[in-house]
Amino acid sequence: MDRVTRLASQKAVVVFSKSSCGMSHAVTRLLRELGVDARVVELDEEPAGADMENALAGMLLAGTAANGGGRGRGVVVPTVFIGGRLVGSTDRVMSLHVAGGLVPLLRDAGALWV
């Protein structure tokens, strides 16, 4: 978990992804189209990728439990951090975007200048 936390705080937006995941590509494309230069960590290309994936699963599980939801330990990619804080996966990022909350969050984190 330390490695995940350290990586997540190194840039305004960090996406933990897998190179073969379509949803990961969708989220990174959305961020890119908004003008965000996100750091993308491809877990399937990292030597410690499996350990990081387990850490992310635990973080997501803790986050959904704290929010009254139950996502379980299924799919963990993409997992998005903005401003060093866990935002969540595709559903959360897209919900924020549709509701108009993603851009202000990105601005507050310094990921957008406009």
Curated annotation (Swiss-Prot):
<dbReference type="InterPro" id="IPR036249">
    <property type="entry name" value="Thioredoxin-like_sf"/>
</dbReference>
<dbReference type="GO" id="GO:0005737">
    <property type="term" value="C:cytoplasm"/>
</dbReference>
<keyword id="KW-0963">Cytoplasm</keyword>
<dbReference type="InterPro" id="IPR011905">
    <property type="entry name" value="GlrX-like_pln_2"/>
</dbReference>
<dbReference type="GO" id="GO:0046872">
    <property type="term" value="F:metal ion binding"/>
</dbReference>
<dbReference type="GO" id="GO:0051537">
    <property type="term" value="F:2 iron, 2 sulfur cluster binding"/>
</dbReference>
<keyword id="KW-0676">Redox-active center</keyword>
<feature type="binding site">
    <location>
        <position position="21"/>
    </location>
    <ligand>
        <name>[2Fe-2S] cluster</name>
    </ligand>
</feature>
<comment type="similarity">
    <text>Belongs to the glutaredoxin family. CC-type subfamily.</text>
</comment>
<protein>
    <recommendedName>
        <fullName>Monothiol glutaredoxin-S8</fullName>
    </recommendedName>
</protein>
<keyword id="KW-0408">Iron</keyword>
<keyword id="KW-0479">Metal-binding</keyword>
<dbReference type="InterPro" id="IPR002109">
    <property type="entry name" value="Glutaredoxin"/>
</dbReference>
<keyword id="KW-0001">2Fe-2S</keyword>
<dbReference type="Pfam" id="PF00462">
    <property type="entry name" value="Glutaredoxin"/>
</dbReference>
<feature type="domain" description="Glutaredoxin">
    <location>
        <begin position="1"/>
        <end position="113"/>
    </location>
</feature>
<comment type="function">
    <text>May only reduce GSH-thiol disulfides, but not protein disulfides.</text>
</comment>
<keyword id="KW-0411">Iron-sulfur</keyword>
